[in-house]
């Protein structure tokens, strides 16, 4: 892996990330393909949209289709016929999401499979082995996602466990030529975030992620922790904010020096009939669009906006036609990829601060509420 920074505009960074399966222009947004597919879209469509890297989920792919199937294809790229880079989450967040179904100990996490009820045991070593079979371009360490809300004592214990698992992850990753990223934890406590970041930097990783955010905390707390944590990470390594977020969240995080993002919002909201547009969020189920023959966004050149009207998409949403979810997903992911391209251009030209004003504060939120 090679990461090259080309320029900055204050803390916002413009770079290039070179990985085994290709080059990623940063800041970049990674569409989420949890089960080895971005819901409803083909790899060719993702390329056309401008996606340079996608995300897969170790936990879910381990359970289905399983390592035997993935290994028979020679890895996740050939299984899903995607020739670009792939980042895989380690499974820590998904195990955290199981709640009472899982039991955490020093060695790892024991849980009941949500697929068939079998008892499973996931450790840092097993997570690294799975991701090696997947042949992920970027491998994430196995960590415990600190719950929210939680008191400082529990958050510290969780953070320390994640640091010990980080060391084990790096040891188990030895010999794998693909990149390995550490994950900063520590909940909503700045001092714990400092300790986590320092510990990970001492171990040494190819890149660093900020985890444990967008887990139910108020946005003000998320932004506070992000502002505090990002400067603690090495300037010459890529920085990844996990699971975030809205267009406004992304622009705010780029201003703090973040390079990589992933989130299910564009595709999940697409399936629910929410489209991101230059005028804010368009809610297709609203009856006001029943006779609206205008495109979803007059300023968008995606396939959906060039070929279909709001009235037709409203009809598809109301009738539950799968074409509607596909067309909406094409539009939303195009919106996100265009947003990232515009961010990169703004940084290159020294105009990022002006660009960010369009997505900050009350003006953008009023647009979202009124379209």
Swiss-Prot record:
Binds 1 zinc ion per subunit. Pathway: tRNA modification; tRNA-queuosine biosynthesis. Signal peptide: none annotated. The keyword Acyltransferase does not apply. It comes from the Bacteria. The active site is at 89 (proton acceptor), 262 (nucleophile). Substrate binds at residues 89-93, 143, 185, 212. Catalyzes the base-exchange of a guanine (G) residue with the queuine precursor 7-aminomethyl-7-deazaguanine (PreQ1) at position 34 (anticodon wobble position) in tRNAs with GU(N) anticodons (tRNA-Asp, -Asn, -His and -Tyr). Catalysis occurs through a double-displacement mechanism. The nucleophile active site attacks the C1' of nucleotide 34 to detach the guanine base from the RNA, forming a covalent enzyme-RNA intermediate. The proton acceptor active site deprotonates the incoming PreQ1, allowing a nucleophilic attack on the C1' of the ribose to form the product. This is Queuine tRNA-ribosyltransferase. One of its GO terms (cellular component) is cytosol. Keywords: Glycosyltransferase, Metal-binding, Queuosine biosynthesis, Transferase, tRNA processing, Zinc. NCBIfam families: Q_tRNA_tgt (TIGR00430), tgt_general (TIGR00449). GO terms for molecular function: metal ion binding; tRNA-guanosine(34) queuine transglycosylase activity. Homodimer. Within each dimer, one monomer is responsible for RNA recognition and catalysis, while the other monomer binds to the replacement base PreQ1. Pfam families: TGT. The keyword Protease does not apply. Residues 243-249, 267-271 are annotated as: RNA binding. Zn(2+) binds at residues 300, 302, 305, 331. The gene is tgt. Its EC number is 2.4.2.29. It catalyses: 7-aminomethyl-7-carbaguanine + guanosine(34) in tRNA = 7-aminomethyl-7-carbaguanosine(34) in tRNA + guanine. InterPro entries: ArchSynthase1/Queuine_TRR, TGT, TGT-like_sf, tRNA_ribo_trans-like. Its cofactor is Zn(2+). Belongs to the queuine tRNA-ribosyltransferase family. Disulfide bonds: none annotated. GO terms for biological process: queuosine biosynthetic process; tRNA wobble guanine modification; tRNA-guanine transglycosylation.
């Amino acid at each position: 892996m090679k990461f090259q920074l080309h320029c900055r505009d204050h803390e916002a960074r413009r770079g290039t990330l070179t990985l085994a399966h290709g080059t990623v222009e940063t800041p970049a947004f990674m569409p989420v393909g949890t089960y080895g597919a971005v819901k409803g879209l083909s790899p060719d469509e993702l390329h056309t949209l401008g996606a340079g890297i996608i995300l897969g989920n170790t936990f879910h792919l381990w359970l289905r289709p399983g390592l035997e199937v993935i290994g028979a294809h020679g890895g996740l790229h050939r299984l899903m016929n995607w020739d670009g880079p792939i980042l895989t989450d380690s499974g820590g967040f998904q195990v955290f999401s199981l709640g009472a179904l899982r039991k955490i100990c020093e060695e790892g996490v024991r849980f009941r499979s949500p697929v068939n009820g079998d008892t499973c045991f996931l450790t840092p070593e097993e997570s690294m082995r799975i991701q090696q079979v997947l042949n992920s371009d970027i491998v994430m360490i196995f960590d415990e996602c600190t719950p929210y809300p939680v008191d400082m004592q529990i958050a510290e214990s969780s953070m320390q466990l994640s640091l010990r698992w980080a060391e084990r992850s790096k040891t188990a990753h030895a010999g794998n030529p693909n990149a390995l990223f550490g994950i900063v934890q520590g909940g909503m406590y700045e001092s714990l975030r400092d300790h986590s970041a320092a510990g990970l930097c001492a171990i040494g990783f190819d890149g660093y992620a900020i985890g444990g955010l967008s887990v139910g905390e108020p946005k003000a707390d998320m932004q506070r922790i992000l502002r505090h944590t990002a400067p603690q990470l090495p300037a010459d390594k890529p920085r990844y904010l996990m699971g975030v977020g809205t267009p406004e969240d992304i622009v705010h995080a780029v201003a703090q020096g973040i390079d990589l993002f992933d989130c299910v919002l564009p595709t999940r909201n697409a399936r629910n009939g929410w489209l991101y547009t230059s005028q804010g969020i368009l809610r297709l189920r609203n009856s006001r669009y029943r006779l609206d023959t205008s495109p979803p966004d007059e300023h968008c050149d995606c396939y959906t906006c060039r070929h279909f009207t709001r009235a037709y998409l409203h009809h598809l949403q109301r009738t539950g036609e799968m074409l509607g979810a596909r067309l909406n997903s094409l539009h939303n992911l195009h919106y996100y990829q265009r947003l990232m391209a515009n961010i990169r251009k703004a940084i290159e030209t020294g105009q990022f601060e002006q660009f960010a004003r369009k997505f900050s504060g009350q003006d953008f939120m009023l647009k979202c509420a009124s379209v």
